UniProtKB/Swiss-Prot annotation:
Pfam family, one: RecU
Top-rank EC class of the record's enzyme: hydrolase
Species per Swiss-Prot/TrEMBL record: Bacillus cereus (strain ATCC 14579 / DSM 31 / CCUG 7414 / JCM 2152 / NBRC 15305 / NCIMB 9373 / NCTC 2599 / NRRL B-3711)
GO molecular function: endonuclease activity; magnesium ion binding; nucleic acid binding
Protein name from the UniProt record: Holliday junction resolvase RecU
GO biological process, one term: DNA recombination
UniProt-annotated stretches for the region Disordered: 1-25
Gene3D superfamilies for the chain: 3.40.1350.10
């Protein structure tokens, strides 16, 4: 039997999109990207009226678009309109917060080449205006997360520029940063550390 849509188009069973399975969450969610984990955490904070933090959109200039079907558009070429600053920003307890999320597979250090000068300058500006700026670093091999204040990132960046190390050792991150606790909800509880570091 042939089934047709109201517009006369033939129904094709194979062309129907497959239902994506519902994600099941384990306690550790190993394999999840840091961005996914933070987005999930921020959604929890927003839903429970704890904080309002969002991922910043990346501004793109679309140059070329193909229309393989009348109702579909495929972007073929796009460029960044401007250099991005940091990944996330928002408000917590009346204070502006702004942070970058980075992950590394290195066991002993975090390479500073993962940062760009405009990101460092942006963090300096946030701090100069009494905002809270920091970086969340994930060591993927250990499934460990650290919150490191912008003043330390800036100091390590300056050290690199004066002939010093081009990375931050894990020991330095452990010394100057705060280990973030992980759980089910919120996944990465960075607000608890903000309370201890900035609001105590």
């Amino acid at each position: 039997m042939t089934i047709r849509y109201p517009n006369g188009k033939r129904y094709n069973q194979a062309s129907q999109p497959q239902k994506t399975p519902i994600k099941t969450h384990t306690y550790s969610n190993r394999g999840m990207s840091l961005e996914e984990e933070l987005n999930e955490t921020n959604q929890y904070y927003l839903t429970h009226n704890i904080a309002c933090v969002h991922k910043k959109p990346t501004p793109l200039q679309i140059v070329k678009v193909d229309y393989p079907a009348r109702s579909a558009a495929v972007v073929k070429e796009a460029y960044f309109k401007q250099p991005s600053t940091t990944d996330y920003n928002g408000v917590y307890k009346g204070k502006y917060i702004d942070f970058e999320a980075k992950e590394t597979k290195n066991k002993t250090s975090f390479p500073l080449q993962n940062f760009h000068l405009h990101q460092i300058e942006h963090m300096k500006q946030v701090v100069a205006h009494n905002g809270i700026a920091f970086v969340i670093i994930k060591f993927t091999l250990f499934d460990e997360f650290y919150l490191l204040d912008a003043k330390h990132i800036i100091a390590f960046w300056n050290r690199q520029n004066t002939g010093g190390r081009k990375s931050i050792t894990k020991e330095e991150i452990e010394e100057h940063g705060s280990l973030l606790s992980c759980g089910y909800h919120p996944r990465i509880d960075y607000i608890r550390v903000l309370d201890m570091v900035y609001f105590s």
